[in-house]
Amino acid sequence: MPDITDLFAQRATLRRSTSLLTAFRFEQSAPERFYGTLAQDTVHLITDLWQQAEGVALRGRTVLDVGGGPGYFASAFADAGARYIGVEPDPREMHAAPQGHRGIQDPRTTYLRASGMALPLADNSVDICLSSNVAEHVPQPWRLGEEMLRVTRPGGLAILSYTVWLGPFGGHEMGLTHYFGGARAARWYTRKHGHPPKNNYGSSLFPVSVRDGLRWARDTGTLTAAFPRYHPKWAWWITKIPALREVLVSNLVLVLRPR
């Protein structure tokens, strides 16, 4: 029986992983470079999952991006023919795009200022609901997930992708110091740079595990697939190994299909 990840698995090569890893170095210094690469990869991910699930292209489908920031993904999804709706609670983030980036100004897209934990959309109103690297920044990540499921129509897809706390990128700009504890890492960062990290432990960065994500997703009865987002296909088995997955999975993708 075909798996919903079959198409994307063909794209999940070591070359892709290396390209994304290279881009990560520019998240803070050149965000347009990092997020541009990530946007294209995300469109490929969603397109492949949708094509495998529905047998049709993404064109004409409504995609809700929860925590869309300044709209780094907006134009990429619009270029793919999707009806893009972005949701972002922080007005500073909405306008944080570098000069020359259309983001929320792209006339083909719609943007809403709202919290992902209280989405201002009706039940069953979108085909695809995506949240990329947001769950670790909210104090109630599974409430965010429940809201995503609520607004996704039966048969649609909700894709929740988040950075794993004990993975190599869990500390974000604090680097690997998060392995000494989040609060301590934040203090060290502040001492070194003269200001707190943007992703500050306990206020804008929270520890989210693979175990808790899988447990929540299974309890919803809608889990269709779970895999490490940036790993090549031959390394996806890591997700099945407790403890090891918490350290080696940098980002977990949960694919949910409401019924």
Curated annotation (Swiss-Prot):
The keyword Transferase appears for this protein: yes
GO molecular function terms listed in the Swiss-Prot or TrEMBL record: S-adenosylmethionine-dependent methyltransferase activity
GO terms of biological process kind: methylation
EC number in record: 2.1.1.-
Keywords: Methyltransferase, Transferase
Domain of life: Bacteria
InterPro entries: Methyltransf_11, SAM-dependent_MTases_sf
Keyword Cytoplasm found: no
Leading EC class: transferase
Stated family: Belongs to the methyltransferase superfamily.
Annotated PANTHER family: 2-METHOXY-6-POLYPRENYL-1,4-BENZOQUINOL METHYLASE, MITOCHONDRIAL, METHYLTRANSFERASE
Name of the protein described by the UniProt record: Uncharacterized methyltransferase MAB_4481
